[in-house]
């Protein structure tokens, strides 16, 4: 079995300029994902998919490979990670580089470690599902969620759960925005991962942080420090 890790990292982040290579406790943010992928021992190759020369330079420094530059039409605010992965697989296949399994690992997942990737890969192989991705449990019951209308009035999505006890409600999970294992065939044939053909690897909340703002970035640093202090 040949395994490929693809790290998508476009250069046009808006809310945090240069997010993928911003400093994170003394190293570029993307370096954590590259090192975890390399140190996991799972992958035959760790490949960057980027449209940005500076990001490519940083990734090469930390051991990733960059055999192509991503097209600009796959690098705007509307381009999906799935499309970037599909494009990378197709380019590599055209270079006679064929892989059985492909993992899309986000550049913004510094809270992971090599052991998590290894455990997730083992579960992916055991389950024989098309995909396996990282997820985490919602902290609050989604059945009691509400929205505000244009007049700032409160409306529950489903009022029947207003008096339900939390322990009586079905647990809900969301994508952790960390990693996605899949067969090469599934990546090329499917455009939607969140279906019964997928399984999940549940991460605890302290290993999940969606880094979209500077506040998120600082919170991720706090979590990283706390996680590493508790490990000793």
Positions of predicted regions on the chain:
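Short, structured coil segments at secondary-structure junctions
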Residues: 42, 62-64, 150
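Short active-site oxyanion
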Residues: 42-47, 130, 206-207
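Conserved core of the sugar-phosphate nucleotidyltransferase
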Residues: 81-83, 101, 110-197
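Hydrophobic helical membrane-anchoring modules
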Residues: 200-202, 207-232
């Amino acid at each position: 079995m040949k395994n490929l890790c693809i790290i998508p990292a476009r250069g046009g982040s808006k809310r945090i300029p240069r997010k993928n290579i911003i400093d994170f406790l003394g190293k570029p943010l993307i370096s954590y994902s590259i090192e975890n992928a390399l140190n996991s021992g799972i992958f035959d190759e760790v490949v960057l998919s980027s449209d940005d020369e500076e990001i490519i330079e940083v990734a090469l420094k930390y051991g990733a490979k960059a055999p192509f530059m991503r097209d600009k039409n796959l690098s705007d605010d509307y381009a999906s990670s799935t499309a970037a992965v599909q494009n990378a697989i197709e380019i590599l296949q055209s270079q006679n580089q064929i892989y059985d399994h492909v993992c899309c690992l986000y550049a913004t997942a510094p809270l992971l470690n090599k052991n998590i990737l290894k455990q997730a890969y083992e579960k992916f192989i055991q389950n024989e599902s098309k995909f396996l991705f990282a997820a985490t449990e919602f902290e609050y019951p989604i059945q009691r969620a509400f929205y505000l209308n244009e007049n700032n009035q409160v409306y529950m999505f489903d009022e029947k759960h207003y008096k339900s006890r939390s322990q009586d409600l079905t647990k809900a999970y969301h994508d952790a925005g960390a990693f996605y294992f899949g067969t090469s065939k599934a990546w090329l044939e499917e455009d939607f991962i969140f279906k019964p053909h997928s399984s999940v690897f549940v991460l605890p909340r302290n290993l999940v942080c969606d880094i979209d703002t500077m506040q998120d970035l600082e919170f991720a640093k706090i979590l990283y420090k706390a996680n590493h202090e508790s490990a000793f």
